[in-house]
Amino acid sequence: MKTIKRIYILALFMLCLSFSHNSALAATVSSDLLKQPAIEVSVSLGNAANELKFEPNSLEFVAGKRYNLRLTNPSQMKHYFTAKDFADGIWTQKVEAGKVEIKGAIHEVELKPGATADWVFVPLKSGKYTLRCSVAGHTEAGMTGEITVTN
């Protein structure tokens, strides 16, 4: 019985050691990502003529690189930057808008007329993702785009 107890304690110790190693590794990786300079990419949601489009409507990112996606809305209407599948495949460091900084998972960003927001993230999963404005009628009017993440 003592042998089984010792094996159990040893297994529990090894499991705890494994978890602490993974936490340290995750902290190191996160720290390394934060040291990368963010690559600046800008997208306009609409334009001064109130056309329903993203400019540019095609975005390309490389997995593992840190980006600052600057979203601006020069139009007189609110717009959404909606790309849920893309957002599920990235690590978001933060979104900054005005004097507010938001941390955690982001799936959609709403920009009111004249607004600007900076979304700092690292793509993790390669693929092609649909971008759209989810304001009623905007997707149907052509306010769509594509996001590509390569390895």
Whereabouts are the PLM-identified features?
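Short aromatic-acidic-glycine turn motif
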Residues: 87-98
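Bacterial N-terminal signal peptides
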Residues: 9-20
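Positively charged n-region of N-terminal signal peptides that target proteins for export
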Residues: 1-6
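Beta-strand cores of secreted/periplasmic/IMS beta-sandwich domains, seen most often
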Residues: 58-82, 117-125
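N-terminal edge beta-strand
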Residues: 34-66
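Short beta-strand and strand-turn-strand segments in soluble, beta-rich domains
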Residues: 51, 96-104
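Sec/Tat signal peptide C-region and signal peptidase I cleavage site
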Residues: 21-26
